[in-house]
């Protein structure tokens, strides 16, 4: 803990987009006017009751919010400790939490008069959500996706194409999420006049980390109300998986100033922390990537290392800057789960709850298996079930040799 504790953990970022030493906006000169225009447009939209009312209407009638808070009775019984609840973001339209943020950004793009939307995607869920909203609002959609992810997430590639998006496979680097984001940024620099870049996580240059967090905070806001109804009090702990970290930030942020609530973020440990992994907090150091300063996987020369996770949505070599800050000030405890642990949790959830989770939240569920058993039976733990696992079935079957 090497930074001064604030009066509130929810007051950041400052006017230049910093969370302590993290965040900021490190962008090409060409993009700076656009970034400043975006910041201004977002500030105006946030203060406009009509924008909020329109967004709430779509969240209710199109996305299907509020998503349920579900007591996972058999998993609770299996672990024999804490009471486990799932926040069912997998039941949203498009199958994950991504749509909460995309709706907000696409409404903002319309407000700014930008007819062309670009996005990056890893697991494909952000791409699907962006393609969905572009179809709904009649906007052109281009999605950049690493060629490796195109291969392992075919169902989502087909969904994007069915929705009218152009999917551009990226073959540079490791051909995964980082490389897709690089290409999207290149496109944006070239087409600033008519293009809006819809970033899928709490990363990128300010105001993106703040904006994406605000659009995702509906998750935690609903949990506060739902857990009061179910248990009559706030939860004792929250847990979520973290790649860039938007699903986690959406759950965590409304609870950051509740000191009684323990908060756990779970990174992807891949083949193990001494081998190939995607755990930026556990194995990284501060550096600058994609417009912000955060913890990154880097070699001794400061070059970005390739991340690995069985989950296409977690294999990013960085983490959102607000998460980096929350780690440094000690408000959130970060842990990591390996590919094997995530697969075991995936199978357990399928068999005990009749819920096929995405491999991303399966990482968080793996750590629930470590945390929950020794806790008292009245301890209330909420896991963010951030997406459904249809997209991962072929990949899981391949890893398990076809034997579920």
UniProtKB/Swiss-Prot annotation:
Name of the featured protein: Tryptophan synthase beta chain
Record function comment: The beta subunit is responsible for the synthesis of L-tryptophan from indole and L-serine.
Pathway membership: Amino-acid biosynthesis; L-tryptophan biosynthesis; L-tryptophan from chorismate: step 5/5
InterPro entries registered for this protein in UniProt: Trp_synth_b_CS, Trp_synth_beta, Trp_synth_beta/beta-like, TrpB-like_PALP, TrpB-like_PALP_sf
CDD domains in alphabetical order: Trp-synth_B
Residue ranges that the Swiss-Prot or TrEMBL entry lists as coiled coil: none
GO cellular component, one term: cytoplasm
């Amino acid at each position: 803990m090497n930074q001064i504790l604030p009066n509130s953990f929810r007051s950041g970022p400052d006017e230049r987009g910093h969370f302590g030493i993290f965040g900021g906006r490190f962008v090409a000169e060409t993009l700076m006017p656009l970034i400043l225009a975006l910041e201004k447009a977002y500030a105006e939209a946030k203060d406009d009751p009509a924008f909020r009312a329109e967004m709430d209407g779509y969240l209710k009638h199109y996305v299907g919010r509020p998503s349920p808070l579900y007591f996972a009775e058999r998993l609770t019984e299996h672990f024999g400790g804490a009471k486990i609840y799932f926040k069912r973001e997998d039941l949203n339209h498009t199958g994950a939490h991504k749509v909460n943020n995309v709706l907000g950004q696409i409404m903002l793009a319309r407000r700014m008069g930008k007819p062309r939307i670009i996005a990056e995607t890893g697991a494909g869920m952000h791409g699907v959500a962006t393609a969905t909203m572009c179809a709904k609002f009649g906007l052109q959609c281009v999605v950049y996706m690493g060629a490796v992810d195109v291969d392992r997430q075919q169902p989502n590639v087909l969904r994007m194409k069915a929705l009218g998006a152009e999917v551009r496979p990226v073959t540079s680097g490791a051909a995964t999420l980082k490389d897709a984001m690089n290409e999207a940024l290149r496109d944006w620099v070239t087409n600033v006049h008519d293009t809006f870049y819809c970033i899928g996580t709490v990363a990128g240059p300010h105001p993106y980390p703040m904006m994406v967090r605000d659009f995702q905070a509906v998750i935690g806001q609903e949990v506060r109300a739902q857990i009061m109804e179910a248990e009559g009090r706030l939860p004792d702990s929250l847990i979520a998986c973290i790649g860039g970290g938007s699903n986690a930030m959406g759950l965590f942020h409304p609870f950051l100033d509740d000191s009684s609530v323990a908060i756990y973020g779970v990174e992807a440990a891949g083949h193990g922390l001494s081998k190939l992994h995607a755990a930026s907090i556990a194995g990284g150091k501060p550096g600058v990537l994609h417009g912000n300063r955060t913890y990154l996987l880097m070699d001794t020369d400061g070059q970005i290392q390739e991340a690995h996770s069985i989950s296409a949505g977690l294999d990013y070599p960085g983490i959102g800057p607000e998460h980096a800050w929350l780690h440094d000030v000690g408000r959130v405890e970060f842990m990591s789960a390996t590919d094997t642990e995530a697969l075991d949790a995936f199978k357990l959830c399928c068999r005990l709850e009749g819920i096929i989770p995405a491999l991303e939240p399966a990482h968080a569920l793996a750590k629930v298996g470590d945390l929950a058993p020794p806790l008292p039976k009245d301890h209330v733990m909420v896991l963010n079930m951030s997406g459904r696992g249809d997209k991962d079935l072929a990949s899981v079957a391949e890893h398990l040799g076809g034997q579920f």
